[in-house]
Amino acid sequence: MMRASYLFTSESVSEGHPDKVCDRISDEIVDLFYREGPKAGIDPWQIRAACETLATTNKVVIAGETRGPASVTNEHIEHVVREAIKDIGYEQAGFHWKTCDIEILLHPQSADIAQGVDALQPGEVKEEGAGDQGIMFGYACNETPDLMPAPIFYAHKILRLIAEARHSGVEKVLGPDSKSQVTVRYENGKPVGVREIVVSHQHLVEDMTSAQVRERVEPYVREALPKDWITKDTIWHINPTGKFFIGGPDGDTGLTGRKIIVDTYGGAAPHGGGAFSGKDPTKVDRSAAYAARYLAKNIVAAGLADRCTLQLAYAIGVARPLSIYIDTHGTGKVSEDKLEKAAAEVMNLTPRGIRSHLDLNRPIYARTAAYGHFGRTPDNEGGFSWEKTDLAEAFKRAV
């Protein structure tokens, strides 16, 4: 039975956090292959990319496996990497987009992996297997308009608003690196207020105090949160260490795939363990997690549950999901087994079916690298297609 009154906390990190710098670089490379492939006459279905990035003081290392056009050279990749770092905003002595050393260690995808992903299976036509085994979770709830848990939704929103002000030139003394954390108070199972707010934000003027940083960030925090959620009892922690001048990869080494809870539901739902960034959609760590969110969101959007957790499982080289599991946490209007059957009916959950339904063979991934992969708005270029609620009516009919 779900608790009625409790506190729940989630964190977010900005695009300038060292791990997020790496996620952005890895996803820029995936996008590069999808942009350049069609120009070289390569079918987007044949593109493969698995890119891992490490970033530290004045150094970026990229390693992984790819399959795509020969036109994507190391020089091309280096240019994309520098432009990404520039866009994030790093022009400091210890990490500058112009001068950091970039080492590229990409090589062709393993033939052993390729044969499992590309090969036809007996009795199936043009069906590709999953790129790896694993379990993936999707989640949705009716706590926010985007059907996301309130703590992670507002933690992202705080940093996104500050980042917009920084990029526009309004907040010139704030650096790219920042973190937020929001402790939400629930009553009768509904979010009603914030008890604790944490914002740690890099500043570009070395002697800025925590109080001065608070003067800068507090208006964005108040703008992000519902008006009556902040009270006299709300506790603020703004740059609680007192100083945050050295930021980004110069202050803390970053790696791709180390913010998987920030990327998803802020701890409000299970996680299968697989990261998203740097992976093309044959990797079900990414594409099946997107599909799981899509299905869970449409179940809630259809009014069939107030909360929904959905699990998918795959085996490498096998097209069909091994299992589909749904839990509506006591909020379902129909049984979970009916929803599980409906999920298999309304969407082809093979890797190829997911890529086709969500139109994932395109350069849409760099935009996902910060502020969450879920709870975002579908865009005209095909980004965040998994956030659509166009299956809601199909679910209603199927149950």
UniProtKB/Swiss-Prot annotation:
Homotetramer; dimer of dimers. Binds 2 divalent ions per subunit. It holds the Pfam family S-AdoMet_synt_N. GO terms for molecular function: ATP binding; magnesium ion binding; methionine adenosyltransferase activity. It is found in: Cytoplasm. Its EC number is 2.5.1.6. ATP binds at residues 17, 177-179, 243-244, 252, 258-259, 275, 279. Pathway: Amino-acid biosynthesis; S-adenosyl-L-methionine biosynthesis; S-adenosyl-L-methionine from L-methionine: step 1/1. It is an enzyme of class 2 (transferase). Keywords: ATP-binding, Cytoplasm, Magnesium, Metal-binding, Nucleotide-binding, One-carbon metabolism, Potassium, Transferase. Catalyzes the formation of S-adenosylmethionine (AdoMet) from methionine and ATP. The overall synthetic reaction is composed of two sequential steps, AdoMet formation and the subsequent tripolyphosphate hydrolysis which occurs prior to release of AdoMet from the enzyme. Belongs to the AdoMet synthase family. SUPFAM superfamilies: S-adenosylmethionine synthetase. K(+) binds at residue 52. The gene is metK. Mg(2+) binds at residue 19. The keyword Endoplasmic reticulum does not apply. Residues 109-119 are annotated as: Flexible loop. This is S-adenosylmethionine synthase. L-methionine binds at residues 65, 109, 252, 283. HAMAP family: S_AdoMet_synth1 (MF_00086). Its main location: cytoplasm. GO terms for cellular component: cytoplasm. Its cofactor is Mg(2+); K(+).
